[in-house]
Amino acid sequence: MNDYPGSGLHARTQAEYTGARAESRYVIPRFVERTSQGVREYDPYAKLFEERVIFLGVQIDDASANDVMAQLLCLESMDPDRDISVYINSPGGSFTALTAIYDTMQFVKPDIQTVCMGQAASAAAILLAAGTPGKRMALPNARVLIHQPYSETGRGQVSDLEIAANEILRMRSQLEDMLAKHSTTPIEKIREDIERDKILTAEDALAYGLIDQIISTRKMNNSAVA
């Protein structure tokens, strides 16, 4: 069963469901900080959010997309002139969830700094590339994967199959346009590359124009990385 039509994603067990809160997947350490207002208890995600960092470390589905969009809009309302950082380690996911986050990133006023840690695959690769030009980064051993949307729709009335096929073609065209807009690679080359999985090292992603720099330590780039 395909849970996300047109995305190539399949059903997962509850234990694997990445849209669930982090606390339901594993134990997150909490720490206490003394402030002028008293004692505050944090988890790492809350602390990162306070520092204007959004960590996208899950599959991109409707639940995680809503979380990211809410954080983007909240951080914009708190200070529309300060950058927002999005750290990415994601296997990708739903195309509609991707476009929801993508449009919100383009909509908000703050610059969006994107950093790939681990992997930015499929939909996550688009989000990595969609950061503000000059502020898109990857760690040295990160990898980026791009490919075309796909679907396993194989049954139903002919008219339904035709509708599904046309939607896949529309999504592919939209994906190609996004990659062309946010990279230095010609769209003709992109069309050829996404016929199959295209795996890029950090160096390859830099050459492709999906990122602007490779960073290995904060010491070299304190002003750029939140």
Curated annotation (Swiss-Prot):
Q: Which proteins does it associate with, and in what oligomeric form?
A: Fourteen ClpP subunits assemble into 2 heptameric rings which stack back to back to give a disk-like structure with a central cavity, resembling the structure of eukaryotic proteasomes.
Active-site residues annotated for this sequence: S122, H147
What are the subcellular locations of this protein? Cytoplasm
**GO BP field:** protein quality control for misfolded or incompletely synthesized proteins
- The UniProt entry lists the main location of this chain as cytoplasm
An example molecular function term from Gene Ontology annotations: ATP-dependent peptidase activity
Give the transmembrane region(s). Answer: none
Q: What CDD domains does UniProt report for this protein, alphabetically? A: S14_ClpP_2 (cd07017)
Query: What reaction does this enzyme carry out catalytically?
Result: Hydrolysis of proteins to small peptides in the presence of ATP and magnesium. alpha-casein is the usual test substrate. In the absence of ATP, only oligopeptides shorter than five residues are hydrolyzed (such as succinyl-Leu-Tyr-|-NHMec, and Leu-Tyr-Leu-|-Tyr-Trp, in which cleavage of the -Tyr-|-Leu- and -Tyr-|-Trp bonds also occurs)
Family affiliation? Belongs to the peptidase S14 family.
A GO cellular component annotation in the UniProt record: cytoplasm
Q: What is its EC number?
A: 3.4.21.92
Short name of any one Pfam family annotated for the protein: CLP_protease
The protein's matches in PROSITE patterns, at most eight in alphabetical order, are given as: CLP_PROTEASE_HIS (PS00382), CLP_PROTEASE_SER (PS00381)
Q: Which Gene3D superfamilies match?
A: 2-enoyl-CoA Hydratase, Chain A, domain 1
Protein name (database record):
ATP-dependent Clp protease proteolytic subunit 4
Briefly, what is this protein's role? Answer: Cleaves peptides in various proteins in a process that requires ATP hydrolysis. Has a chymotrypsin-like activity. Plays a major role in the degradation of misfolded proteins.
Task: Quote the HAMAP family the UniProt record gives.
Answer: ClpP
NCBIfam families cross-referenced by the UniProt entry: PRK00277.1, PRK12553.1
